[in-house]
Amino acid sequence: MARVVPAVIRALDILELFLDRPELSAREVTERLDLPRTTVHELLVTLVERGYLIVVPGQPVRYRLGMPLFQLGSAFAGRLDLVREAQSVTRDVAAACDEAVHVAVLDGADVVYLVKVDSTHPVRMVSAVGRRLPAHCTAVGKILLAALDRPALDGVLAKGPLASMTPASITDAERLRAHLEQVRAEGVAADVGESDTAMRCVAAGVRDHAGRVVAAMSVSAPIIRWTPQSPEKWTALVREGAATLSARLGYRTTSH
């Protein structure tokens, strides 16, 4: 089992003291946590240096929470908003196509599925909320990788060789880069048997209020229901669904 770092625990204990007090002095922190004054001083200096605490001048000097904590809380709240809103929108998209609809986010070199609404057909895609797949093998993953800037994409590709889930998976980094350029230009991605030879999938990006691609929505179905009309029909549907979800997250096309 990994070792717990006492200094980190103490720093978190300090931050949690501010849950019921807007400002605290070093003496109050010391008394509440029963820690040595030198330890508290070092932790407070470190938290101030990183912006997690702000110094309030006076006698005595006091401290209050800094902006990074608000940003972390906002990021967490934003993820909750994404899931809540996505559940509603994916149900509407699934009702329109009667195929599996997913919303996923990028986590390192993988995608993680946050929301899924299944089709009513007896033959359907095998997936689940929380499932992880190599991003480059999926339509949602390609959308999310294409949204990264060059350094971020380089970092993902540097994690190791590109895994092959099927013979159709893209395993060459330069070929993937070229493919992502096309995805970026078109705003839509496809998985043509790259994660499962029996499945087809199309995806589009979901943007937040700042215009950042924070998730991707997809429509997936087995090849037995794939027709020449499917790509165009599903692409239009997933674009519309992703745009609807983006709007619910505060994105406005007229402002970008």
For every predicted segment, state its role:
Residues 74-122, 147-150, 176-182:
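All-alpha effector-binding/dimerization core of bacterial HTH-type transcriptional repressors
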Residues 105, 115-116, 127, 137, ...:
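Residue-level recognition of conserved beta-strand positions in structured domain cores
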Residues 1-84, 243-251:
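N-terminal helix-turn-helix
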Residues 155, 161-164, 242-256:
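Cysteine/selenocysteine-centered motifs that mediate thiol-based redox chemistry or coordinate metal-sulfur cofactors
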Residues 172-242:
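Extended hydrophobic
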Residues 122-197:
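Short, solvent-exposed recognition segments
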Residues 4-8, 62, 66, 79, ...:
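Short, structured helix-loop boundary elements
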